Amino acid sequence: MFKDYSREKFAKENFPDLSKHNNVMASHLTYELYEKYWDKVTPNGVTLDKCIQTGVDNPGNKFYGKKTGCVFGDEHSYETFKDFFDRVIEEIHHFKPEDVHPATDLDETKLVGGVFDEKYVKSCRIRCGRSVRGVCLPPAMSRAERRLVEKVVSNALGGLKEDLAGKYFPLTTMNDKDMEALIEDHFLFEKPTGALLTTSGCARDWPDGRGIWHNNGKNFLVWINEEDHIRIISMQKGGDMRAVFSRFGRGLTEVERLMKEKGYELMRNERLGYICTCPTNLGTVVRASVHLRLANLEKDKRFDDFLAKLRLGKRGTGGESSLAEDSTYDISNLARLGKSERELVQVLVDGVNVLIEADKRLEAGKPIDDLTPRLNSSTGTSISATASRHMTL
């Protein structure tokens, strides 16, 4: 601290100018909160300034939507700066400070439906993020911690058997042949260029400690140390979401079990569920999605209203910021927090069934207004427009 500066004076002089900012962090970081927390540190040395710097550096604007503007530096960041993060989380997820995320539920047998008409559903995918307990999250982790995560996770993956068995490809030693194969399969992730990851520190030391693992069937995939410690993905062509969810649950359970055998656990908060880098990715951190062809509904002005009522989001065929090719959209659940994994997959399944029915009716020249009650009664979790635009998973 500067000589002759009191704690309060330093806080006032160091408070960031957020007067022209348009992000969630800036909406909730009052001077009173900053003065309360600026000199607090987590057990790993993470400060509030570390958590908010990405939002200070990237103010956003009203034309491109409201970015999150903050990250967690470790699993203690939430509890250490609780009053601030509670406000951020409530805006993003409509999840109040007294709410509690439910227990994990990966039981595929409780899923109702989930096998779609392949005339409409071209592929199914479920992915989630997870973090290794006791290690800083990517914005604050050291090279040693990143390499430890790579070792712990890749060793666990090496213990998978039968249809989950596969191979790990470290980015640092990847040869041209393997790289070409991964690019062809659309598995390879590149160095992050987005503001959240670069200014928060997630992309430091690239590609050190990063890698990709996939099973021999190429329908179960794991990214290590991209935005989060672990990204687990189950996918396949066609309309069998039940099979995708079953494989996802088995793989996720086995990876966690194999890690525990070596003395490592996943980060999980009693109130918020699983913890990852961005406050948008809490709870289940699950994004279930389909590539869905809607040649008729896409032309109807009610398309976006249907999606909103079903609590679903849409992207182009190639993902975020891409266009739909051959009327095919990436449709996914918006919520991450407040319901179990199985419940969120059910939200997607129910919603996709409604969208397919609407498309069929429009093709036949039939009305779709009577589907509205089904939309209003559909299961799901409310989530803000902020989260719908900025879920990074």
Swiss-Prot record:
Q: Which GO terms describe its cellular component?
A: mitochondrion
Q: Which InterPro entries match?
A: ATP-guanido_PTrfase, ATP-guanido_PTrfase_AS, ATP-guanido_PTrfase_cat, ATP-guanido_PTrfase_N, ATP-guanido_PTrfase_N_sf, Gln_synth/guanido_kin_cat_dom
Q: What are the Phosphagen kinase C-terminal domain coordinates in residue numbering?
A: 120-362
Q: Where does the record place Low complexity bias?
A: 377-393
Q: Name one GO biological process term.
A: phosphocreatine biosynthetic process
| S-S bridge residues | none
Q: Which UniProt keywords apply?
A: ATP-binding, Kinase, Nucleotide-binding, Transferase
Q: Which family does it belong to?
A: Belongs to the ATP:guanido phosphotransferase family.
Domain Phosphagen kinase N-terminal span(s) in chain numbering: 7-94
Q: Whom does it interact with, and what assembly results?
A: Monomer.
Tell whether Transferase is among the UniProt keywords: yes
Q: Where does ATP bind?
A: 123-127, 186, 231, 287-291, 315-320, 330
This protein's name: Glycocyamine kinase
Q: Name one GO molecular function term.
A: ATP binding
Gene3D superfamilies per the UniProt record, alphabetical: ATP:guanido phosphotransferase, N-terminal domain, Glutamine synthetase/guanido kinase, catalytic domain
* EC code(s) of this entry: 2.7.3.1
Q: Where is this region: Disordered?
A: 367-393
Report which reactions are catalysed by this protein.
guanidinoacetate + ATP = phosphoguanidinoacetate + ADP + H(+)
Top-level taxon: Eukaryota
- Residues spanning the membrane: none
